């Protein structure tokens, strides 16, 4: 029987958690939405729906712009898939990150118009802004789905982690985007409330263009 077990309303995020949700119900709810809000995560009967607010979205979008700027400057091919629903019925798991990218697998997946995660890999790099506690352990969820690298921001600082033998290990810089460090990203984000976004990205581009 499906039941609401938690509701969290906060400044950066609103979350609702349901338990006892069948896979087919989750898929139907996901397909009936307009757009990608609320963002959904599903893990063996537990469904979490999260609606981000301004600060959450601003952090996620800025990180995404830095990833795209860095890949352009360093000539690294990527495929952006934003908050695509990554779902595996065989695992009874699904997630929608703030930003998602193929890097290592970009060339392989370039010709594909649609993704089938029963045969296609999960995104190589996902960005997860989590300013309030999730009812689902996202790192375990990402690991089970085979995400190679996770950038996680808690509203204060960024942590980068790589998947090693099924467990995420912290690292100071990205493997998918070599040379880009968490400290560089945090430096830009620390100025987001005092400097306009265009200026931030222009300055970031100038610093990495050498």
Model feature map: region roles:
Residues 1-210:
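Gly/Pro/Ser/Thr-rich low-complexity, intrinsically disordered segments predominantly at protein N-termini
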């Amino acid at each position: 029987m499906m039941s609401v077990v938690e509701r969290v309303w906060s400044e950066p995020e609103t979350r609702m958690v349901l338990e006892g949700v069948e896979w087919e119900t989750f898929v139907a709810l996901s397909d009936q939405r307009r757009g990608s809000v609320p963002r959904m995560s599903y893990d063996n009967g537990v469904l979490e729906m999260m609606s981000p607010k301004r600060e959450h979205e601003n952090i996620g979008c800025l990180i995404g712009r830095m990833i795209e700027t860095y890949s352009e400057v360093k000539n690294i091919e990527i495929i952006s898939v934003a908050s695509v629903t990554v779902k595996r019925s065989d695992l009874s798991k699904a997630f929608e990150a703030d930003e998602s990218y193929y890097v290592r697998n970009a060339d392989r997946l370039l010709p594909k118009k649609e993704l089938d995660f029963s045969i296609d890999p999960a995104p190589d790099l996902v960005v997860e802004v989590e300013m309030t506690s999730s009812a689902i352990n996202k790192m375990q969820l990402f690991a089970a789905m085979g995400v190679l690298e996770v950038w996680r921001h808690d509203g204060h600082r960024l942590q980068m982690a790589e998947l090693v033998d099924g467990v995420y290990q912290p690292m100071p810089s990205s493997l998918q985007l070599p040379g880009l460090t968490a400290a560089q990203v945090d430096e830009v984000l620390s100025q987001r409330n005092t400097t306009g976004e265009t200026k931030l990205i222009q300055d970031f581009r100038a610093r990495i263009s050498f």
